C-alpha cells in the first residue's frame, strides 16, 4: 500500500486541474465504470461519460467537468494508496467527516467549493493513513 505524501498530493492537484477532461473521464470510466461516474457527475445518461472520454468527444458543462476533476482526485488518491475497489466502497460509504453522507453524494450535489474540498480532504486523510 502506497502512502500519499505532501509532494505526491501537490502533484495530483496539478494533474487533476491540467489533464484534458477527456482523460479524466476515461480514467474514472476505467476505475469506476460509466454508471458510477455518471452518478458522481449528476448525469442521467451514463453513455455520456464514454463520449467525453473519446479523443474527439464533446466538452462537458463546467459543473460536470469540475465534478469529474474532483472525482479524479479522490479516486486516484485512494486507488493509488489501496485499489479501485476500495475507492468505490469508500465513495458509497457514509463518512462522519461529511455529516454521515456518502462522499459520492456530496461530490454529486456540491454547490459550494468547500463541500468538494471536504470530500477531497477526507480522501487525502485515508490515503495518507499509516499503520
What are these regions (language model features)?
Residues 1-131:
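Non-transmembrane "mature" sequence context
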Amino acid at each position: 500500500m502506497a502512502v500519499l505524501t505532501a509532494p505526491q498530493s501537490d502533484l495530483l492537484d496539478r494533474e487533476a486541474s491540467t489533464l484534458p477532461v477527456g482523460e479524466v473521464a476515461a480514467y474514472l470510466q476505467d476505475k469506476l465504470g460509466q454508471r458510477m461516474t455518471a452518478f458522481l457527475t449528476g448525469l442521467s445518461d451514463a453513455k455520456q461519460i464514454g463520449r467525453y472520454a473519446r479523443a474527439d468527444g464533446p466538452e462537458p458543462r463546467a459543473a460536470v467537468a469540475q465534478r469529474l476533476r474532483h472525482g479524479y482526485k479522490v479516486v486516484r488518491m485512494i486507488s493509488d494508496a489501496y485499489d479501485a475497489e476500495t475507492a468505490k466502497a469508500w465513495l458509497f460509504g457514509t463518512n462522519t467527516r461529511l455529516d454521515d453522507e456518502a462522499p459520492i453524494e456530496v461530490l454529486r450535489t456540491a454547490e459550494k467549493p468547500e463541500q468538494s474540498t471536504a470530500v477531497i480532504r477526507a480522501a487525502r486523510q485515508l490515503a495518507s493513513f499509516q499503520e
